Amino acid sequence: MPLTGIFFNVNGKDVNEENVDPELTLAYYLRNKLGLRGTKLGCEEGVCGSCTVVLGTWDDCQNKAVYRAVNACLVPLFHVHKTFVITVEGVGSRDKIHPIQDRMARGHALQCGFCSPGFVMSAYALFSNQPNPTIQQINAAIRANLCRCTGYRPILEALYSFSSESGGCCGGNKTGGGCCKDKSSSDEDGGYDEKLLSFNDFPKYDPTQEIIFPPSLRVFSDSETPVTLKGDRIELLLPKNIDQFKKFKKDRTVISSGLITRFVSTRNPKEFSQKWISTKYVKEFNEITVNKDSVVVGAALNIQKMADTLTSSLSINIGKEIDSFIQKFSSPQIANFATWTGAIISGAKSSLSVSDLLILFNVLDAKLTLLNNSGELTQVAIEEFAEKKLFATHTIVNAIFSRSLTGFLFCLKLGETSEQDSTNFNFAALVGNQVSRIFVGLGGQPKRLTSLEVHIDALKGLSVSDLCQTTEMSDYKNVKIALTRFSDFMNHKEKTEEIEGINYLQYFKPKTNESAGRPIANYFNERAITGEAFYVNDIQAYNAVHLGFVLSTVPHAEITKIDVSEALQLEGVAGYFGVSDVPGNNTPGLQISNMNFPDDTTIFADKKVESVGQVIGVIAANDVVLARRAAKLVKVEYKELPSLVNFKEAIEAKSLLGDVQHFGKDENLVKESLENSSKVLEGECDIGGQEHYYLETQSSLVIPGEGDELIVNCSTQGTSFTQLMVAETMKIPAHKIIVKTKRLGGGFGGKVNNASWIACMCAIVAKKLNRPTYGFLSRADDLAITGKRHEVHAKYRVGINFDGKIEGIHYQAWLNGGWSKDHSEGVTMVMGLMVDDVYNMGTIRFDGYPVKTNSNSNTALRGYGNPQSKLINEGVMRRIARDVGKSTEEIKRINFALEGGRRYLGGKIHNDALVECWEYCKKWSEFENRQSGIKQFNKNSTAVKRGIAMSSVRFGLPHPGPTGHGIASLLINLDGSVQLSIGGTEMGQGLNQKMLQVCSEALKRPIDTITIVDCSTDKVTNAPETGGSQNADTNGLAVLACCKKIMSRLQPIIDKNDGEWEKSIREAYGAYVPLQCTEYGTVERAKFGVGEMESPYNTTGACAVEMEIDTLTGYNRVIRVDIVMDVGESLNPALDIGQIEGAFIQGYGLVTCEKITFNKTTGQLDQNTAGKYKIPKASDVPKDFRVKLLGINNANGAQVYSSKGIGEPPLMMSCGAVHSSIMNCIDNWRNENGIHEFVDTISPLSAEKIQELCSKK
């Protein structure tokens, strides 16, 4: 009789689970059954790495445990039978922190902390197998872990400190000179001799102290009896040997290892009953045999095991290319778990996509052993398997590779990005004395290029055009790339890449303060890195329901019918809720415009939909998987209406969300200024949108209380705004609603309006059902529902003199607002207010048009219109430079608006170090010398080009108006401990840590005697949204005001008690001295001689960026970055440098790999999954990354300990410099090839766009 259970171990504790649902993932089991919530859910697609855990198995051949990192969000629980599961909680805790966690926590290697457990686990898997890893091994281990906050540098630096290679963070430093940070730079840099951290002081890593492999798993005697697992929809059989498999497979509708099959099945909402059989535990399918002549790899083995076997068993020149190919093909987490068989079958089934492994298996002339339905074994060539679709009637048992293969293997994979991406085209060639095989993949099945193989010997003598003609392939562009690279390979077979030196530098001026100004690690780092930090979806509520979101599938239509009957039939579904269930206002954003811009977004669609992804209603169910399934069963019928999805068509149709906004001079005055100029230039710019890609998706938990009370736990950037939104929606006074935010897993502007809508939906359901209600968006739903950065189309006409000095400019900008207002009018306004950037442009006019389209309603995103203005102006400056024959940097410099001068709307420029930053950066980066070197490089390089560019930023702080204030509440307990609460939310920017340091400095109390509690409306209310880079400034002023008031009461008592704090507090209590207070913080502009609409001070900076592009593939890489910023006297240099680096990488992504497009016909977002939207990876971090804080103290009294805000300014600078640097690369190629037409700002400069611009038409 079959068994019904599985046995495994989690963090040292044995677990027996009976009748596991085959559809249950390891992540949901760990989080919801075992309460191990350090395993985060960021995408549930195996893309982001936040859910990474480690699986250990005992290898009898090696007599040791082998560990591998996997995506717990994909792994079915039944796959962990006889496995040691290790989560971040099992690695270490705050009481006994692991060295990996310790170095990352104290090394400032996290910001919001949501992705951090995943990085720890990826590193832990590597170190468990290789205690002395190389830098290349570390890079490979974390290459599929995504981080949106840090810019990766501190993560890499912390992990590189474990490297066995000399040089630590400078691994690859072949001089033996040690770490760049151990060298004092005081001689050349005048006092910038501090380093954020030296890992030399940390304890050495001791692998013998790791948790041991559980003896229970080693001695466990697994029965030969097959296991049967019965879930709600699936009965799964797990046979143990091939005879059992043959016996039972006839009765099973699905044959699979179970990984991808489970992933696909859970996305099928229908009720069904299926019988599966898994190859996972079939002995013969898990065997590896290495003979003298062949290598046999079992069908149930994972991709990495297959690759490792081939790498070690085939000739070195073939093996090393297989290893390199697999790293580009897949993430470690996927390769460590997905079977090579699944990849082969998926490729063989597809008539459209390109299969990487099929290409590899074809070029290696692999043979497959197949099992037919009669139980007979047969052997076929891989080509025959794919061509005859034998997967429909046969099961793969193993693959056989000949060990007699000789020569060199060459593989090329082309996608949107250079690694771990879907493939558009691939090419593989095996070239040797005996065997020459070449295959190409371009949609559908691999094609053998036999006609090209006969030309191998003559490769050096044939031109690429000649070779292309022999391929009989229509895709000339990709074939040309492949053959060019192949030709290079043939001529340099023995060449190996040198490890590049790594140069990470962070300079700041140290301060002698006890707290403020010191690079102290964020107090919550240890909590996050050990999995102990809770985010909204980690909070556990009794008897809760979860929401599944019913979304529009058409861009514009009337809703004629909503049928929820099939969804409500599912057991565990509590109900459907839509617009008729809203007790108050369905458009609450129109009623609370005093805290935000008026927003006509509906909570639920009312009679019509205006975008794909608009929320029509929600399903409430007992668990989130069921809720999402049920939501997909809701049938919505539409009467479709004309739609405007395409942005340019909407502009032509004059479809607007609001009034046209005009700033600057009268149109006639600008026209006159241009007519009087020596020359007028004009151009057009197109700037794409950007997704926030916070790792924690939108999350809310609303708990109903007595009466009308609601406790709203929400991942929001504005607790008071969310409170008012919920109050207006629920028709409940705000004082009965408490909104609490502990921390956000990233925000970037995307968790203001968006977060509040989700909270309102949860509140409606919680009140109706009187049950706690979770609203936790899947990544796909988050991408579909929420807004992005505004796409912009702009035109300009600029008048200049013969030197390139701007005398007047007229901007027109159209912003894609989407289907509702959201923040579109605000972003348009900020573009208009700040369009002069860092320049004095004479007579200026800006006309802004917020455009309505039937697409996502776009919203705030880091920079809030400023990055778009920056990119427009980069194009303007390049255009002028080209026309007058000067460098773009010269044109920028002569057009700077200087301190003491005025912005174009009349505000005076106060406390500004723009020129100092620019000149320092130019010298520090050796800009002019490197320009000469790049010129020589480009002269000698045909396809690969380099460029260098500088950009700068000026960002006025704090902002004028009601948003430019902070609020804080301070109370002192009788034991002397201090509790602080502020109106700003912590979302990775280090706001809470800075406020602790400010409070510590002001009270002269040790920082560990102060705690900062949740941002909550019952402690501080009416607080502005957190954003705009000003919250340390404004909330810092509020904290100082609280401390000043408290100390004015306490100081006489403290003096009387000779400074004894605890005794003084008790005495003050007895004397009825108030030990708590709440204060606002704002800059009294008149007091400092600053106008009401002027900025009291400016955060400024400059950067130089050197880029490289491959004009054939379109791929780019950052060679070196030099950033110089003035943030006054930094409150915490580590946090500020972290913000600078993170903003730089986010800005790099904006102008390179991050793309937002919509299907013109269906209105659907093309990048509608985590895998389709590309954010920068750790491999994109420049190897030479230098940041310097000037530390200029010209404080005017309006600053908190002479500091200035940070957050957004580096992003504007980054996107400008990266874009211009790439354009310099492109211009060089175009000039060399006789193409002289000017290319205005186009963003993003994706691989496809670079290829397009670097091609002869």
From Swiss-Prot:
GO molecular function, one term: FAD binding
Originating species: Caenorhabditis elegans
Database matches in CDD domains: fer2
The protein's name in its UniProt record: Probable aldehyde oxidase gad-3
Enzyme class: oxidoreductase
Signal peptide: none
Residue intervals of the 2Fe-2S ferredoxin-type domain: 4-91
A biological process from GO: endoplasmic reticulum unfolded protein response
Active site: 1208 (proton acceptor)
Catalytic activity reported: an aldehyde + O2 + H2O = a carboxylate + H2O2 + H(+)
Entry's EC annotation: 1.2.3.1
The family this protein is said to belong to: Belongs to the xanthine dehydrogenase family.
Domain FAD-binding PCMH-type as annotated: residue spans: 229-459
Cofactor comment: Binds 2 [2Fe-2S] clusters per subunit.
